[in-house]
């Protein structure tokens, strides 16, 4: 009972402690709120300052970027101006060099011509003086002789007088002497007058010589001026001649290439001749093999057929013969009309010789003879089958159909025409699946179905003296798939016949379906045998293509002749372009003067831009210095604000210690009960946890803010350093550019001085260019050379025409070879048909002996 008394004391102390803690907490919260408000205010100020600084930096960067763009633009303009100046310098140097060379050349030619003219004038004056001196000497000699004769007469008279003649005679002699003196005086006076007149004439002649010399000099000067004026025309004329010469040379090269191609075509044509011979050989072998297979199949079918079937075959044969006779009569009338209108057309083979080596015609003839010999040798390698003889009318109809087939453009005919015209009904089953390319051109030209007599099929044998080649024996011995099918069919039929009983006469050994199938296959084989030969049609197309190429070459020759005429017309039209060329030269001079004035204006504009660039650079420098001052001031403000924040933090720590001391000094009433104390303690603990979390959060927040401010200060410091470096670089670059601009300005002034000098020299050169047209003689020589070149080109064209004529003759020879080849093929077809129609081996031997030919001209006309 004594223990519950003192229990309320700890509760009161706890309550007091709790109250103190609540007060401390309230004070701490108030201080925290105040600090947050102050921090937010300061943060807003810092944000405003930061945004203001960012805007200032953006403006400064924009100004710097604009200044850099202006600098780049000005640099590009300066580079362009420098490039243009370099181009102008190069053009001026080139023009000066060319003008100086032209002036030197013209001076040299002028000096040569003046020296030649002076020499000519001196020679003419010397000739005139020499002639006059000769005349004067001759006249003086004549007068001296006359005076000597007169003096001799006077001396004789005086001697006579001195000899003491009689006085009478003396008077007479004196009279005679006076008369002679008068006569002499009458002769001498006109002679003196004539001498004076001759002297006057001599002076006049000398004056005329001087006048003629002066007039000749004037004429020569006028001639030189005219030559100067004609220089541009002659230059253009020579340029046109050079272009025409190049065009003619290109045409000649094209002709050479075309001739080379044509020669290549000739070589290909020769190769095709050899290939065609082998093709005919193979076609004959294939044709013989197909004929042999037809004979064997017909013999086997004869064994299979019954007497009833043979009778039906005979009836069908008679009907077909009657129809064929009627059609033959009708077609004979039509063919007579057609033969009068149409002629045999054989495509011309275009074969041209090589350009470099002109092969003689004798070599071609030898080649053709060898070709003929190789074609004739085909007769010795042919193995011809023998069949039942045709009637005489069938043989004539075959020749008529063959002649009509030759009148067309191809060597083959349709199977329906010849099968109806010749009256062949039976087809071999073994050839039912063969293509038309397996028979060659002979089958195409002789595509007819065989009409063998069923009685004599088994009695045919090969002639004893007719030998086969190895290829023919191999082709005969080898079995084709069609032969194997036929053999299997016959073996099945013969086995059926052996196993079955012997049927009475009149009954079939095969069924109706097999019989119909056999007739269809025989009909198909005959149709395929009569198809057109693809090889012949391809060969005909090749011949037509070669003929077209020949026509094209002729057209090209005509075009070249037309081009020559046009070139001559163009040569005549060149003199009409004189005024246009003068206008062009005048316009080019005006354009050059305009370009020079435009360059002067651009140089002045570049100077103005340089001054503007200097002003903008000085303005940018002042702006950068002002920005640097503003940045320094803002840095000082930030440092002052940091010092103030440190002081505030110190003051806050002092207030915290003051509040703690105040809470300790206050009275704290503890709670009365343990339950209340426990609740109060729990409440305080929760408040302490909240306060600690808030303090930690505030501490972290303040640390983050401090770090942010430090990083911001460092970034501003780095930005400031970078800005200082960039500005320093820009200042150095601007200094360099100013130095380069000053050097460019000096260069521009020097170029202006050079421009003035060039203008003065240009005026001098323009004055001197008026004397550059004194080279007509050289141009005339060039014209003569061009005319000589034209003559050589015409000679070359004449040679090309001769080559074309020679190639035409060779083309005719090759065409004749083709005709002979076709004639030989037709003869072979006729011989094959005769052998096919032969009724005995003796007849076949006689036909083979008759075919021994030594020349193509011995072939009969078909």
Swiss-Prot record:
- Annotated segments matching region Disordered: 315-340, 355-374
Coiled-coil region(s):
11-328, 534-816
Q: Name one GO cellular component term.
A: glutamatergic synapse
Q: How is it modified after translation?
A: Proteolytic cleavage by caspases in apoptotic cells causes loss of endosome fusion activity.
Q: Which residues carry this modification: Phosphoserine?
A: 374, 377, 407, 410
Q: Which Gene3D superfamilies match?
A: 1.20.5.340, Single helix bin
Name of the protein: Rab GTPase-binding effector protein 1
**Source species taxonomy:** Eukaryota, Metazoa, Chordata, Craniata, Vertebrata
């Amino acid at each position: 009972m004594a223990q519950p008394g003192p229990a309320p004391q700890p509760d009161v102390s706890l309550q007091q402690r709790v109250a103190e803690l609540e007060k401390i907490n309230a004070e701490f919260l108030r201080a925290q709120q105040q600090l947050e408000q102050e921090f937010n205010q300061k943060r807003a100020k810092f944000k405003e300052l930061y945004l203001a600084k960012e805007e200032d930096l953006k403006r400064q960067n924009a100004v710097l970027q604009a200044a850099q763009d202006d600098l780049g633009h000005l640099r590009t303009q300066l580079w362009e101006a420098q490039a243009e100046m370099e181009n102008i310098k190069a053009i001026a140097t080139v023009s000066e060099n060319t003008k100086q060379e032209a002036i030197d050349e013209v001076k040299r030619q002028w000096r040569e011509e003046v020296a030649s003219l002076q020499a000519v004038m001196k020679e003419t004056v010397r000739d005139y003086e020499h002639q006059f001196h000769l005349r004067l000497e001759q006249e003086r000699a004549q007068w001296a002789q006359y005076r000597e004769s007169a003096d001799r007469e006077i001396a004789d008279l005086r001697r006579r007088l001195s000899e003491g003649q009689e006085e009478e005679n003396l008077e007479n002699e004196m009279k005679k002497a006076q008369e002679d003196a008068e006569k002499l005086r009458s002769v001498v006076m006109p002679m003196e007058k004539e001498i004076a007149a001759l002297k006057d004439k001599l002076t006049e002649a000398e004056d005329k010589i001087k006048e003629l010399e002066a007039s000749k000099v004037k004429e020569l000067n006028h001639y030189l001026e005219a030559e100067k004026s004609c220089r541009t025309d002659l230059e253009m004329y020579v340029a046109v001649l050079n272009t025409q010469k190049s065009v003619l040379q290109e045409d000649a090269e094209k002709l050479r290439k075309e001739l080379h191609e044509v020669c290549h075509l000739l070589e290909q044509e020769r190769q095709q001749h050899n290939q065609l011979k082998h093709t005919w050989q193979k076609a004959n072998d294939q044709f013989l093999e197909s004929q042999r297979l037809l004979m064997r199949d017909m013999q086997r079918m004869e064994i299979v057929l019954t007497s009833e079937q043979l009778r039906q075959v005979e009836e069908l044969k008679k009907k077909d013969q009657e129809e064929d006779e009627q059609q033959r009569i009708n077609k004979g009338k039509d063919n007579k009309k057609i033969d009068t209108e149409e002629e045999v057309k054989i495509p011309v083979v275009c074969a041209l010789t090589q350009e470099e080596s002109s092969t003689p015609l004798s070599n071609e003839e030898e080649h053709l003879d060898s070709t003929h010999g190789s074609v004739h040798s085909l007769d010795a390698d042919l193995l011809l089958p023998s069949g039942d003889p045709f009637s005489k009318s069938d043989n004539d109809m075959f020749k008529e159909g063959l002649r009509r087939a030759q009148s067309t453009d191809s060597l083959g005919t349709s199977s329906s025409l010849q099968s109806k015209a010749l009256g062949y009904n039976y087809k071999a089953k073994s050839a039912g699946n063969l293509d038309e390319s397996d028979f060659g051109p002979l089958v195409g030209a002789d595509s007819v179905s065989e009409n063998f007599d069923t009685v004599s099929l088994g009695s045919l044998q090969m002639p004893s003296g007719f030998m086969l080649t190895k290829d023919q024996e191999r082709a005969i011995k080898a079995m084709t798939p069609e032969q194997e099918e036929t053999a299997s069919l016959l073996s099945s039929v013969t086995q059926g016949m052996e196993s079955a009983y012997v049927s009475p006469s009149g009954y079939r050994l095969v069924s109706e379906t097999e019989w119909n199938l056999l007739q269809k296959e025989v009909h198909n084989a005959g149709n395929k045998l009569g198809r057109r030969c693809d090889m012949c049609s391809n060969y005909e197309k090749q011949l037509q293509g070669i003929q077209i190429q020949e026509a094209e070459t002729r057209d090209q020759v005509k075009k070249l002749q037309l081009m020559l005429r046009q070139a001559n017309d163009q040569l005549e039209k060149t003199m009409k372009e004189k005024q246009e060329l003068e206008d062009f030269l005048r316009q080019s001079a005006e354009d050059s003067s305009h370009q020079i004035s435009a360059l002067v204006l651009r140089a002045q504009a570049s100077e103005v831009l340089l001054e503007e660039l200097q002003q903008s650079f000085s303005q940018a420098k002042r702006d950068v210095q002002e920005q640097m001052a503003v940045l320094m001031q803002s840095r000082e403000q930030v440092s002052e604000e940091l010092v103030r924040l440190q002081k505030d933090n110190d003051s806050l720590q002092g207030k915290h210690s003051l509040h703690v001391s105040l809470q300790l000094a206050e009275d704290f009433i503890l709670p009365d009960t343990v339950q209340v104390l426990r609740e109060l303690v729990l409440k305080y603990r929760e408040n302490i946890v909240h306060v600690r979390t808030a303090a930690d959060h505030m501490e972290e927040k303040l640390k983050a803010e401090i770090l942010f401010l430090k990083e911001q200060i460092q970034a501003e410091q780095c930005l400031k350093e970078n800005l200082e470096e960039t500005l320093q670089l820009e200042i150095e670059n601007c200094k360099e550019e100013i130095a380069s601009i000053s050097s460019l300005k000096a260069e521009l002034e020097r170029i202006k001085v050079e421009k003035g000098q060039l203008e003065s020299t240009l005026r001098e050169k323009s004055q001197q260019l008026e004397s550059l047209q004194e080279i007509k003689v050289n141009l005339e020589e060039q014209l003569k050379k061009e005319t000589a070149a034209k003559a050589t080109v015409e000679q070359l064209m004449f040679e090309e025409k001769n080559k074309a004529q020679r190639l035409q003759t060779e083309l005719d020879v090759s065409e004749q070879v083709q005709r002979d080849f076709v004639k030989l093929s037709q003869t072979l077809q006729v011989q094959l048909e005769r052998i096919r129609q032969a009724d005995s081996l003796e007849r076949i031997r006689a036909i083979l002996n008759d075919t021994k030919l030594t020349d193509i001209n011995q072939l009969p006309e078909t």
